[in-house]
Amino acid sequence: MATMSSISKIIFLATCLIIHMGLSSADFYTVGYSQDDLTSIERLIQLFDSWMLKHNKIYESIDEKIYRFEIFRDNLMYIDETNKKNNSYWLGLNGFADLSNDEFKKKYVGFVAEDFTGLEHFDNEDFTYKHVTNYPQSIDWRAKGAVTPVKNQGACGSCWAFSTIATVEGINKIVTGNLLELSEQELVDCDKHSYGCKGGYQTTSLQYVANNGVHTSKVYPYQAKQYKCRATDKPGPKVKITGYKRVPSNCETSFLGALANQPLSVLVEAGGKPFQLYKSGVFDGPCGTKLDHAVTAVGYGTSDGKNYIIIKNSWGPNWGEKGYMRLKRQSGNSQGTCGVYKSSYYPFKGFA
């Protein structure tokens, strides 16, 4: 097996390292590197090895490790250049730092859709919170005990299931007082209108829970693959909802009015490199509004004069702020930062 010194020589001969000696004020523990790490190929290799250990990365061959190192190095340079721009957020060496942006998009974002033609059309008159105009300046459903720990969808395009389940977990806690971790795998296997690990619908997954209920994740654990539906074989009670409704599109007031009352299933454009490598702070792009990823809005607030929405992601706790992102609101775009106001749904349980 090749030694680290031989890897260093191979990479050094194959590539020309461009040294960036910026004066980034980012803390090492925030972004995962220091400026000293950029001064030599040896320091970069040491950084890569420590990053691999932290994120449990194992590669099948020395060629694969060299290839991943080169992507890691390129991403690090992009991170460092971005962090010098005095943005309201930091990028960092998260678990996606060895993936090209194309690889990242293929594995972790993709097909999600807000509507399924076989279901009822919802108009603004059906919106529960249309008369809510006086809502608190901030709310965090995590602090209210209505949010389960951050989960990880893995290399399965099941974000739609995680987003739906998080909203059902939230409304179940709000109505019954019980916070239960529910089964995303049941939706992946059993929502026949969605496509398992290849994407899915907010609407049909919510309708599935309304029609059938959903088991806890302990009874029906997540496996990051689609299998035959086994819901009828599982014991124990299910959590059900009465139905679901849509938040009027492209309206921040309606969005915040609903979010003040419960977590929301939302879609965003998450395929850009800044979103991939986000570490902390209030994210304001660049990103577009071509929706490709489902997340859960679990609160909103203000920090240092910057207003934001708290979104819970399904990429594990090593992405972002322990699995969360603060997404800028009042962006000047009616669709919201990354299109967050375009497609939002919420379940209801025992009230309309």
UniProtKB/Swiss-Prot annotation:
Residues at the active site: 159, 293, 313
Function as written in the Swiss-Prot or TrEMBL entry: Cysteine proteinase with a high level of diversity in substrate specificity.
Signal peptide region: 1-18
Species: Carica papaya (Papaya)
EC number: 3.4.22.6
Catalytic activity: Specificity similar to that of papain
Matching Pfam families: Inhibitor_I29, Peptidase_C1
UniProt KW Disulfide bond keyword: yes
The name this protein goes by in its record: Chymopapain
Example of a GO MF term: cysteine-type peptidase activity
